[in-house]
Amino acid sequence: MAAQRLGKRVLSKLQSPSRARGPGGSPGGLQKRHARVTVKYDRRELQRRLDVEKWIDGRLEELYRGMEADMPDEINIDELLELESEEERSRKIQGLLKSCGKPVEDFIQELLAKLQGLHRQPGLRQPSPSHDGSLSPLQDRARTAHP
């Protein structure tokens, strides 16, 4: 009888949900370890993007010194990364900087070089649900706007 109780106790500990959890109380220690590796990678990538964004801001301030009102609101890295070629990216950047009275060629070439080391962040910019063109961007925003 005591052996049966001991057997039940050992069996219940083995089947206990707390035993099925990995370190830190999360299910499966291997899964948690994999998640940490992913987080480290994402942090490094995000830091690189942040560095490029700071560089862009600094260079725009130099290029538009004395003409701050003409400075573009932003140069969206994800929009540039979505473009197929460097030529398209270059044209897009030139279009954004058309109001600048200073030479922008060096800035464009440096930015294109910095973009080569970056990857699009799918969570930061979602493609439009109506990418097939059935709705205008304004209609799409109105349809997907949160109440």
UniProtKB/Swiss-Prot annotation:
Region (Inhibitory): 35-120
Ranges annotated as biased composition (Polar residues): 127-137
UniProt family annotation: Belongs to the PP1 inhibitor family.
Record gene name: PPP1R14A
Disulphide bridges: none
Residues covered by region (Disordered): 1-37, 118-147
Gene Ontology molecular function: protein serine/threonine phosphatase inhibitor activity
Alphabetical list of InterPro entries matching this protein: CPI-17, CPI-17_sf
Entry-annotated residues carrying Phosphothreonine: T38
Biased composition (Basic residues): 1-11
UniProt tissue specificity: Isoform 1 is detected in aorta and testis. Isoform 2 is detected in aorta.
GO CC annotation terms, alphabetical: cytosol
Subcellular location: Cytoplasm
Highest taxon, organism lineage: Eukaryota
Protein name: Protein phosphatase 1 regulatory subunit 14A
Pfam families with a match to the protein in the record: PP1_inhibitor (PF05361)
Sites of Phosphoserine modification: S26, S128, S134, S136
GO biological process terms, semicolon-separated: cellular response to xenobiotic stimulus
Function per UniProt: Inhibitor of PPP1CA. Has over 1000-fold higher inhibitory activity when phosphorylated, creating a molecular switch for regulating the phosphorylation status of PPP1CA substrates and smooth muscle contraction.
Keywords: Cytoplasm, Phosphoprotein, Protein phosphatase inhibitor
